Amino acid sequence: KNMEDFVHLHVHTQYSILDGQASVSKLVDKAIADGMRGIAVTDHGNMMAIKEFTNYVNKKNGGINGEIKDLKKRIKAIEGGKEECEDPAAAVAECKTKVKELEAKRFKPIIGCEMYVAPRRLYQKEGKEADGANYHLVVLAKNEKGYHNLIKLVSKAWTEGFYNRPRTDRVELEKYKEGLIVCSACLGGEVPKKITRGMLSDAEEAIQWYKSVFGEDYYLELQLHKATVARANHEAYELQLKVNEKLIEYS
């Protein structure tokens, strides 16, 4: 079945230690084989896979990129009078149409990170229970500005917020919000975690805060995967279904 209208936005590679197993190349190959138009990489607390990810996708898009480059050269030649043709305007329009068609066929690498968000400030490391805890948050770059802001957030999480894990906080997220899309994440996310603890008013507060900061770029994440492995934590699936019901209600 063609999966072109479905894209994975929460994905861990082998760079998510103890949580991801798949290599970047195999993930991309599988997504392409399934007819998907793109895939995100959102490793835990780091962006170590991104260079390998973008390089491999560029390699897979090599043929298409070559055609686009040739068409753009031809457009420039026609517009510069270096290539003669009966109807220059029509020829340029045809080339531009082909460029758009080819660009739509390119596989899209979506750069992201599943960050850890400190309940208080990222620099608070006093040994209190709150400082040892953290919430998961999927953060995606939707443009170049978002990519640079994501790099700043992740870098600062390591250099200033590290306490058991590299952490950011709400203040930093608001400071570097431009160009970012955020998702509420798995059961480790702030909203799901508060729902499972019965802290519904706190869960609503978190939703309202993220909505006020990120607007239409904030999404509540539903998860429906059921593990078939005997050793898996099957309680997590039932718990996620209960969380899903509440998330749908909030949305």
Please annotate each region the language model reported.
Residues 1-251:
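Phosphodiester-processing cores and adjacent nucleic acid-binding clamps
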